[in-house]
Amino acid sequence: MDDVRGALLQQIKDKAVVHGKVTLSSGLEADYYVDLRRITLDGEAAPLVGQVLLDLTADLDFDAVGGLTMGADPVAAAMLHAAAARGRRLDAFVVRKAAKAHGLQRRVEGPEIKGRRVLVVEDTSTTGGSPLTAVEAVREAGAEVVGVATIVDRATGAAEKIEAGAGVPYRFAYDKDELGLD
């Protein structure tokens, strides 16, 4: 395990794993919660997120990254900054849960993604519902989705659902076993 990946894993274990009954965004109940906003919005951990996810997706060709607000927003920003630090141009975008009823009435915010190759990201994935919603929205906006990447996969079917439903590769940096969770 390289230093950056190991450092991020330790940050997640120390700051983001919360034990106790919780209801997840998927509606499922769990005995633990991985609150990755404690990582993706943390000044020490967020840069590690960007580096780890760029390394994880290094073989995919994309020039924009984003996903469904809110979980994906700081992940995309971390990747944008990590890419810039490496001398690479990478734009970020935000997918709203619904199009705005005013202004430009856009569902996908940020630089134009029509005709571009994009990576959809998420902080943690349970059923794959949020990334699939984002994939559908960015395809409607005219982008080509090259993959989906998440920081933590809960090993509850997201990988299979995304690969079958969206027809794109699914990557994750850590699984629940690496976090010591059942």
From Swiss-Prot:
It comes from the Bacteria. Homodimer. GO terms for molecular function: magnesium ion binding; orotate phosphoribosyltransferase activity. GO terms for biological process: 'de novo' UMP biosynthetic process; pyrimidine nucleobase biosynthetic process. Keywords: Glycosyltransferase, Magnesium, Pyrimidine biosynthesis, Transferase. The keyword Transferase applies. Gene3D superfamilies: 3.40.50.2020. Catalyzes the transfer of a ribosyl phosphate group from 5-phosphoribose 1-diphosphate to orotate, leading to the formation of orotidine monophosphate (OMP). It catalyses: orotidine 5'-phosphate + diphosphate = orotate + 5-phospho-alpha-D-ribose 1-diphosphate. Orotate binds at T126, R154. Pathway: Pyrimidine metabolism; UMP biosynthesis via de novo pathway; UMP from orotate: step 1/2. Its cofactor is Mg(2+). Pfam families: Pribosyltran. Its EC number is 2.4.2.10. 5-phospho-alpha-D-ribose 1-diphosphate binds at R96, K97, K100, H102, E122, D123, T124, S125, T126, T127, G128, G129, S130. Belongs to the purine/pyrimidine phosphoribosyltransferase family. PyrE subfamily. This is Orotate phosphoribosyltransferase. It is an enzyme of class 2 (transferase). The gene is pyrE. The keyword Magnesium applies.
